């Protein structure tokens, strides 16, 4: 897990958002490092136009809510050799995952089976409550 974006280029999310890697998950899809925390994960890709338009709301949400750990999975990470395994894991723990962007909510490291209704800050607020 890192605060640094994979390619260190414009358009990537920045701190306080952290980038997740395959090694940050247990084999059962739970998060390793976030017991007793609420975590919001944006699954996104740099080529995705909808992701690009959703990133500012996610970034603002992360800044306004330090009590929630905001994380991201870069679905087209050019540096990671395990991104395919990570996307497959996400598809396994969230069968409704069909593409980018998508959001995952974890409480105490465990996925909360919930779907988000949109990509705005208000939608993110509603999703985590």
UniProtKB/Swiss-Prot annotation:
Positions of the Thioredoxin domain: 9-129
Annotated SUPFAM superfamilies: Thioredoxin-like
Organism, by scientific name, is Invertebrate iridescent virus 3 (IIV-3)
Family in the record: Belongs to the thioredoxin family.
* Keyword Disulfide bond set for record: yes
Q: What does the protein in this record do?
A: Participates in various redox reactions through the reversible oxidation of its active center dithiol to a disulfide and catalyzes dithiol-disulfide exchange reactions.
Q: Which keywords fit this entry according to its UniProt record?
A: Disulfide bond, Electron transport, Redox-active center, Transport
What lineage is this protein's organism placed in? Viruses, Varidnaviria, Bamfordvirae, Nucleocytoviricota, Megaviricetes
**Protein's name according to its UniProt entry:** Putative thioredoxin-like protein 041R
The record lists its disulfide bonds as 48-51
Catalytic residues (positions): 48, 51
User: Where is the site Contributes to redox potential value?
Assistant: 49-50
Classify the source by domain of life: Viruses
